[in-house]
Design a protein with these regions (language model features):
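Extracellular beta-rich repeat passengers
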Residues: 1-156
Length: 156
């Protein structure tokens, strides 16, 4: 739970897996309090690995509100893995909006309810988006102007 804003992940090592992995409790997906973070303004660039495929991985009962994300460089840029997480997205407890992914949503839940069609009805959501993947492109993306702030350019 809690809120994080203005996050950048830029992977280069092929052994790196998820750009974000969000879990509630691996031993009890229904455990309370339920993890329910709010994430805003994310730019996530994967390493292009065919073995470490996941960008945003939502599982183990987690809920999430994500507003403003670009995810590229992973074959599965957005993955849903457990029934509780799927249910929270399907019933609106979790909300994804303004999320652009360079690929398609993957729901690994048997009989999953939150599918590409649901994702695409969210405000500003897009699959197969053309997203810049070099650091210069990321830092120059005008829709994420905060990336050009002095605190970001100082750590490059």
């Amino acid at each position: 739970s809690g809120t994080a804003t203005n996050l950048v992940a830029y992977q280069t090592d092929a052994s790196c897996d998820c750009l974000i992995e969000a879990d509630n409790n691996g031993d009890n997906f229904d455990a309370t309090p339920v993890a329910h973070p709010t994430l805003r303004n994310l730019y996530l660039v994967g390493n292009g690995s065919s073995e470490n495929k996941r960008g945003i991985r939502l599982r183990a009962g987690t809920r999430a509100n994500i507003d403003g994300a670009k995810v590229t460089g992973k074959p599965n840029p957005l993955t849903i893995e457990t029934t509780q997480t799927d249910d929270a997205l399907a019933n609106g407890t979790s909300v994804l909006k303004n999320v652009q992914i360079a690929g398609v949503l993957k729901n690994d839940v048997t009989g999953g309810k939150y599918l590409s069609a649901n994702f695409l009805t969210g405000q500003g959501n897009a699959e197969n988006a053309q997203i810049a993947a070099t650091w210069d492109d990321v830092a120059g993306d005008l829709s994420f102007a905060w990336l050009n702030d002095t605190w970001v350019t100082a750590v490059q």
